[in-house]
């Protein structure tokens, strides 16, 4: 018997999305971003399905070590870099690349005693203003990295876009111009493009692209769908009806009794709630897919359950499947109803949700 709720992960969709992104960036290698437990899809699940990727991008050293322990031998890159002097030796031991975005990291590299140098990606702040060396720091920091025996040569170069998910925003082109101006004629690989830039700013694809959300079949752009770019949703979040009840006009349902039926109907209770990561703030009308149609959430989402209006003539029964998002109901559309982004929905599922590779 399959557990519920569960996130069904399509390995075929993951592979198809990688293939599609290679088609969109044929001159670039792919650094598949699998941070945050593979965007909620399961870190090892995703890495093994995407074994043909040229490398994997991660946020935490622990994630990289989990991949190495799971038999992944591909290039690994720590996108936030390292934070403790002891981490530097771990990078060498497990052959892990690191971003260097702050002088404190450079100081740790300069002070380390290592068996071999570390592969470094120097991050330049071209306009995101979150991580990276300012443009006026670039020359001095680059020369220190060049002089550091613990840094493998050539030094790789990167930046991150603030507004690539706004296809009409000129800020991305300006960031790319600044990057090119600072790095022209320098050796080393370059990476600028995240998912949005890969899809919308082809001129920024460079040596490596760093797709994250697009690998999972989701568009990074609000109001857009992954399928518009030939991508397939890799996650289907499913549960089931655990009750179907006749409900009279005027009667409330759920905590606070704030929703009341305008007419006689049937309500279905779905076994999923905010304890599973489904947003408590999902408003009335948020769609759920039941037996080939969309039905609206009514009443407040509770810890373990939510309620949907099935309609007076519904023939749904206990045990029927309810799809919270997936092929028939894109996660981007659910996110728009709730007032959030698809990234948040797929990454906030709790351990109560079984993640099952199909």
Curated annotation (Swiss-Prot):
Entry annotated with the keyword Cell wall biogenesis/degradation: no
The keyword Acyltransferase is assigned to this record: no
BP terms from Gene Ontology: D-alanine biosynthetic process
Enzyme category, top tier: isomerase
Keywords, in A-Z order: Isomerase, Pyridoxal phosphate
Protein's pathway: Amino-acid biosynthesis; D-alanine biosynthesis; D-alanine from L-alanine: step 1/1
Molecular function terms, GO-annotated: alanine racemase activity; pyridoxal phosphate binding
Residues at the active site: 35, 255
PROSITE patterns for this protein: ALANINE_RACEMASE
Residues noted as binding substrate in the record, renumbered to the chain: 130, 303
Cofactor (UniProt): pyridoxal 5'-phosphate
Chemical reaction(s) catalysed: L-alanine = D-alanine
Modified residues (N6-(pyridoxal phosphate)lysine): 35
EC number(s) recorded for this UniProt protein: 5.1.1.1
One cellular component term from this protein's GO annotations in UniProt: cytosol
Family statement drawn from the similarity comment of this UniProt entry: Belongs to the alanine racemase family.
Function statement: Catalyzes the interconversion of L-alanine and D-alanine. May also act on other amino acids.
Protein name (Swiss-Prot/TrEMBL): Alanine racemase
Species: Shewanella loihica (strain ATCC BAA-1088 / PV-4)
Gene name as annotated: alr
